[in-house]
């Protein structure tokens, strides 16, 4: 959040520099991400008074003699501007000066005439009319007549200021405003806080009745509104324009600026409804009806549902509560009567609606973090004061304050000084703690028994118990008072990884060695992800646990498979131009025994592998699995199995012995065609996925690996070209070959052939067999005997012939 240094000074008598204040804010828990000087990039630019002017013949230039005080009383500078006159004070960038954007100014000849600098426009100094009047005029920036020649330009045009870009943590929504930060500044400096004026007077009665009602008090705990007649649209005063500009907003009109100013100053979002556009002069806060539509001020149309909270008139929605007003009720130059709204909306409702619709605003950002129920009262009072001060309209006596019925009371925490010091681990004097809490607008009532009854300000909803009070004390007292000490106990155990953690780390390293990078995704998605993989309705993966309070509808169920998340990551990479990669994720999936759940679900550790790219193939993933098996001293078998999301002819189930571990293969052509990626990517990309039950895999690991010496006898290699039916799988052939003899070691498929010299429905598969005996050299006779047995088994079991 951007907070101008000069605006803070309006509430607190600050006697430190911006840099010193940055350090103090950091010490009390507020990170200043950036301290931005407004005069950044500007040097050696001063006030210059034009004392002589002469038109340069044959050119569009004017030769000026400029008085720049101590820098020289007769500096000659040529300019192409025409809006200046003799005696004007203008910004003069002298020889060796710099301007925003890294522009360096040097003395040079302009069409044959020496020019020792440059006379500047407001734009060249990074100014606009909101920051300094006249800055957007075409030509030079004309400064006030009383400007002193030679004075640095920054204070003259208001650039002697800083912007604090402060990171506001989620637990401090009360600091989402300039006033909120000013409270903290006042406390840390020990200075009084000067509150902005919030008094106003009603001057007339309403010309017609207005109906305001709240049908969803659970989503709108407080709704305040005030009717203002005879609206007078006009320009905002300079000070307000500057406030808005320093925070990154442009001035629009006095009334619109007041609502924006209240948001920035008080942290209270506001909206104003043009009552001439509100049907039935009725405002109703309710849940949207299914299918209702609204066009917001930014001209975007949204279709709503009952999860969305809306502000409606007698006929239609006129605002998305807490997010943005509707185009059908916004003010314009013809507006004459307005109903100003200040409210508190449920943060979860605003967040979900904002994310579901993809619609964000400064208001929604504040409501998502939280706006306390006292804030609308202060915000509305401040806005009405500004309306009266700027003479924007006539404030009527008609106002509304609708609540959910809960009392608005300060939280009370009963504690003792000893408890607070016990949390801190240091001793802080009682009076020091009381002073700190009172500076932070807490009240401390010391009881007869020595305990404290501490009440928190209404805006401090984050304070719940005495440890919170301890935090308030130490961040103001100073963390540097806490002296590091050694533990006073010898019963400290050595850290280390347990067996499961070591196995997981080993798995990750084995996959990393194969060129795979680890991915990390959220533990939830939606049924749309399961639909994307064509998971059948009766599949176990459909028994997903629904989240009662999801972040959004697309994150509404706990995941039952990792593959959908992995595919989303791959698609996201492809959309962003990353056309190849190898990824893995090791994470739990959540499986319910029955729905609705009545016991804790099983969190099954799962391993998912993904590879994508034009050069990736089936053996990329198979090779990674083989490396994994070898690393744990296992042997995997592969069997044909149909999986909804994998290509039926380029996929397999993975087994370790009789235990099924999972599946892997190429993404099915149908699903590949449905992916939201460019057509050329669909045509050129190969996407492979695999998902294994990691717990089942680890159950196959027999403790630590045992040393097996290499055989001193060379293995005998033998190639076999086999003709088989098209439906016969490589796994079936390998399994039959292995069972023929214990001498059979490694089996590698090196060729598949279909075509001439083969009958229809037949294919040729060529394997290299490795035959060895750890105790002796394998003889030629033994090799022939084993090969003969292999061929016999293949013919008997699978009908396979030697080619």
Q: Would you name each region that the model predicts?
A:
Residues 2, 20, 439-442, 462, ...:
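A carboxyl-terminal module marker
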Residues 39-43, 200-202, 491-492, 496, ...:
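Beta-rich nucleic-acid/ligand-interaction surfaces
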Residues 33, 47-78, 242, 246, ...:
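Conserved mixed alpha/beta core segments that line enzyme active sites in large multi-domain catalysts
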Residues 114-130, 135-140, 154, 162, ...:
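Mobile "lid/hinge" segments at catalytic clefts and subdomain interfaces of large enzymes
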Residues 5, 23, 53-55, 189, ...:
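Glycine/proline-enriched, intrinsically flexible loops and inter-domain linkers
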Residues 413-579, 718, 770-774, 782-803:
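Extended, well-folded interaction surfaces typified by the phenylalanyl-tRNA synthetase beta subunit core
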Residues 1-202, 206, 339, 358, ...:
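Phosphate-backbone binding interfaces of nucleic-acid-interacting proteins
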